Amino acid sequence: MRNLYYETTLHKQIRDKRTNRKERIEKDIDSYGNDILVSDELKEAYDQTHHLWSTVGEHTLRVTASSVMICYALRKLGIKANIPAVVVGSLCHDLGILRRDEKYNSKRECSREHPVDSVKVAKEIIPDLTEQSADIIERHMWPAGSSRVPNSLEGVIVSVADKYAAVKDLIKGSDINNTGVRNTIQSEADRIREKHSK
């Protein structure tokens, strides 16, 4: 016999936990990334296609939400990551790609050069960009497209989240895309975009 009270209570706790996690993600991204979220560069990022089915802006927010979620998961294991550096690094990691057709002669050149260009754009938005955030941005292409390994755990987090989001972007619409994690990340990205586009 099923215990409906238990099931209802359990579902409510899970729902409350997910809502709390979403609110924490949004709070962290808003707190540490506000200057970037309101920047003209990130707004422009929504006008440029990226990974076939996405835009640079949508991809960026998925990477950021995924990165923060990884930080929370690691915290449960007793591993503390620098969330402000992760937020700044992930929000800026692909801003150098903007207007890529005007800057790069090939996809290979874009892949190789955009991390350095992204650091330059980040420094325009945040003049006192930390070395750690700059390293996260500059080395985010590892291991696909670059042999330059990130110098910090935070750099690895953003790099992994970037690859995860890129795969999700490429397979958008497939069954593998319809998971709770994907929906959480997408809803966070949508909510942040909506909030900052007003």
List the model feature ranges, each with a label.
Residues 37-39:
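N-terminal glycine-rich anion-binding loops that anchor highly charged ligand groups
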